[in-house]
Amino acid sequence: MDEFKVTPWDVEGLVDYNKLIEEFGTSPLTDELLEKTAQLTKSELPLYFRRRFFFSHRDYDKVLQDYESGKGFFLYTGRGPSGPMHIGHIIPFFATKWLQEKFGVNLYIQITDDEKFLFKDKLTFEDTKYWAYQNILDIIAVGFDPDRTFIFQDSEFTKIYEMAIPIAKKINFSMAKAVFGFTEQSKIGMIFYPAIQAAPTFFEKKRCLIPAAIDQDPYWRLQRDFAESLGYYKTAAIHSKFVPGLMGLEGKMSASKPETAIYLTDDPEEVGRKIWKYALTGGRATAKEQREKGGEPEKCVVFKWLEIFFEEDDKKLMERYHACKNGELLCGQCKRYLIKKVQEFLKEHQKKRKEAEKKVEKFKYTGELAREQWDKAVPEALKG
């Protein structure tokens, strides 16, 4: 197995997810936990759980226990608005929507326009505010409940700073440095930022569940060190794998490599061009050789995208897998199938994105949960 690297800022190599569970000290998302989820929600699990796109967790078992006992829980996730969103960014939001809908819980979505300004030297504050609005449209298009979802932008929801101050008092520099690798060159705003990122985990006196990619896990380790000293729960998390870019299974889809990504605003022609030109397949050198030896779907980005999100039907996915292995299916056929699936998804998403322009105010300011948060006092435990 080649070496791989996973940090909150960078993912390189072909990730060994079992090894990553050991390195990060998380727990595998077991059959028992998924069966319990299906039982409590009285629902069939979505493909991102069935196919183990979400594979790891911290205290998800306790979240389910809290729900079953009547204590409940709440959801928290976010988006750093440094540019347009792509397929890899949006899939965890669909999993979050399923959890909100099936468990009937509140959801807080933090838009970290301040963080991206601090961490990205080339971005102005106006840039991150612009992308915040654009990204919010994509997030609303997923279909969250507007009265149980609060989307807040750090630069606007300044109450979060008042909550972050006592949190920052719990974190010394050596703790932050150990988790985030800060150096003498790190901006002082970057060093303080983990306190702001932790603040939403204290929005309710319940356990917080964060659905996110595994590379974001370090942000919540610090919270778990001090949460109980403030009279709150350690935050829980469920972790997803990475959506690979078009050019290979190593690393993850990246906005810094536009040819590897399908953006949520791409038009049908661009989708077709990118997938046809750049998508790595598990095919052989010639069609004749592929018919004789069969393809290698386990090495194929096209198959991986279908597995992660674009083929809902488990039976059809396995039929495609075996047809490829048996040499009955050629790469061009699979690429055309994926192109059609992605185009259909984006057509619907872009329609909902346009409709979202009229819903921004409700999610940020006037919905039931939004109004409650704007009006609510800072919890006593977080007043220092």
Swiss-Prot record:
It is found in: Cytoplasm. Pfam families: tRNA-synt_1b. It comes from the Archaea. One of its GO terms (biological process) is tryptophanyl-tRNA aminoacylation. It catalyses: tRNA(Trp) + L-tryptophan + ATP = L-tryptophyl-tRNA(Trp) + AMP + diphosphate + H(+). Keywords: Aminoacyl-tRNA synthetase, ATP-binding, Cytoplasm, Ligase, Nucleotide-binding, Protein biosynthesis. GO terms for cellular component: cytoplasm. Transmembrane segments: none annotated. Its EC number is 6.1.1.2. GO terms for molecular function: ATP binding; tryptophan-tRNA ligase activity. A motif ('KMSKS' region) lies at residues 252-256. Its main location: cytoplasm. A motif ('HIGH' region) lies at residues 81-89. Belongs to the class-I aminoacyl-tRNA synthetase family. This is Tryptophan--tRNA ligase.
